[in-house]
UniProtKB/Swiss-Prot annotation:
Transmembrane segments: none annotated. It is found in: Cytoplasm. The active site is at 146 (acyl-thioester intermediate), 239 (proton acceptor), 241. It catalyses: L-homoserine + succinyl-CoA = O-succinyl-L-homoserine + CoA. Its EC number is 2.3.1.46. One of its GO terms (cellular component) is cytoplasm. The gene is metAS. This is Homoserine O-succinyltransferase. It comes from Methylococcus capsulatus (strain ATCC 33009 / NCIMB 11132 / Bath). NCBIfam families: PRK05368.1-3.
Amino acid sequence: MPLVAHTDLPTFQRLREEGQDVLSVERAARQDIREMHIGLLNMMPDAALEATERQFFRLVGGANPIVQFHMHPFTIEGLPRGDQAAEHIARYYESFDRIREEGLDGLIVSGANVTQPHLQQEAFWQPLTEVFDWARSNVTSILCSCLATHALFQYSYGVERTHLGFKRWGVYSHRVVEPLHPLVADINTRFDVPHSRYNEIFREDMEAAGLRVLVESEEAGVHLAVSPDLFRVIYFQAHPEYDTVSLLKEYKREILRYFSGEREDYPPFPEHYFSLEVGAALNDYGQALRSARRAGRAPPPFPEEFVLRHLDNTWRDTAKAVFNNWLGKIYQITDQDRRKPFMAHIDPDNPLGLA
């Protein structure tokens, strides 16, 4: 929670300059604690639908312990669904019409699987742009994850993402490059984040559009950037929401694709994710799997218990800190009426007073 500058002590101004939340007495007096309403547009495929709910709910729930958060999951048309996922959505999700009617303070937009060479050719593109159009006028801040970042960037600025020609896959070291921005204030200046993508928006493309890059990796590129107003849209290219085992599940899925003949090459390891001990065990497993494939035998059992004992999570605490900063800023500037994005005195084009 922010400090209140109830005296002229110079330390308050010094902390403001360092990016610390410090409210004036007048602004603090206008803050009535109420619950916050956060939407989750979940576009992930059936197998990851509920895991994605847990991942983002966990990050929101791990934020400020004083404020209560109401989560509002919903989805859109144009995404293929099996019977079980469709039933889950029908039972537990809200409609976009209801979301629009009742309003949100913040909106998280997940990634999605794609089947077309260009995002605008996807069946979900038009429904997704309708959500974007509404949210940009009615929600205090939108937080986009990976594919959603690429989609909103293209929709807003007309610039398509670039295919890398390979999969950026693993856990990469990142550095905060704008330490005074409130989103990254008081977090670790170096930290890891998982990436899992074939496409990228490069720093030069973001800066040409007026975005401000806050966190990047020498090896993996930009992770975190913000819209020109510095808060209305938060762009993630990586996956800070990932569980410790998320990349392991992806790796196992690729192994099964290789064994079934869906891919020709044996999958490489996610970079900087497995320890040397795990790598050695998985190399042995890979040899056994190849032998079984050549001989037409069933695949050997995966050494999951051993692998799980040696996996580390080097990103969760920083992810929680960033989400806490994001939600805290929303709370300070959103209107008491959740259908209105800002308090009356807040400039929508410069909501943090920093642009």
